[in-house]
């Protein structure tokens, strides 16, 4: 399968993983970090979900493109789901993991949000990596 189609499918999978993590797993205590709508207006989730979907598709495309370029340099040879997860985790560790851990040192009030970001991005990247590893040959 071509990398761009695999990237779009991985973006959709990442979107659903992200929706699950932020909608079902990380719900307690996150109200402190939300900007409330003006008084008397409901929360309009449509535009936010749309932006998240577009960003997830872009993320999937970038992940698939980078995976295709670097798949021969991975420890897991021959591609496959484990290679995709390895690639995703290798990208996650020096970027998102260290960033959220480092920010948690200074911004102690935001630590619950940073911990949620830490774990949700690990799940999101591994789901997308699994899909890309399965589909890109």
Identify the residue ranges that each predicted region occupies.
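Juxtamembrane/disordered regions of integral membrane proteins
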Residues: 1-137
């Amino acid at each position: 399968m071509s990398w761009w189609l695999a990237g779009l499918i991985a973006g959709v999978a990442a979107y659903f993983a992200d929706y699950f993590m932020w909608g079902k797993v990380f719900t307690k205590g996150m109200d402190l970090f939300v900007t409330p709508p003006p008084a008397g207006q409901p929360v309009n989730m449509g535009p936010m979900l749309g932006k998240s979907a577009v960003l997830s598709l872009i993320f999937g495309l970038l992940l698939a493109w980078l995976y295709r370029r670097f798949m021969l340099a991975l420890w897991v040879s021959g591609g496959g789901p484990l290679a995709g997860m390895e690639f995703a985790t290798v990208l996650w560790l020096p970027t998102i993991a260290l960033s959220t851990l480092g920010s948690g040192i200074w911004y102690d009030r935001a630590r619950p949000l940073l911990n949620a970001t830490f774990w949700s991005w690990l799940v999101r990247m591994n789901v997308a990596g699994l899909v890309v590893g399965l589909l890109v040959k």
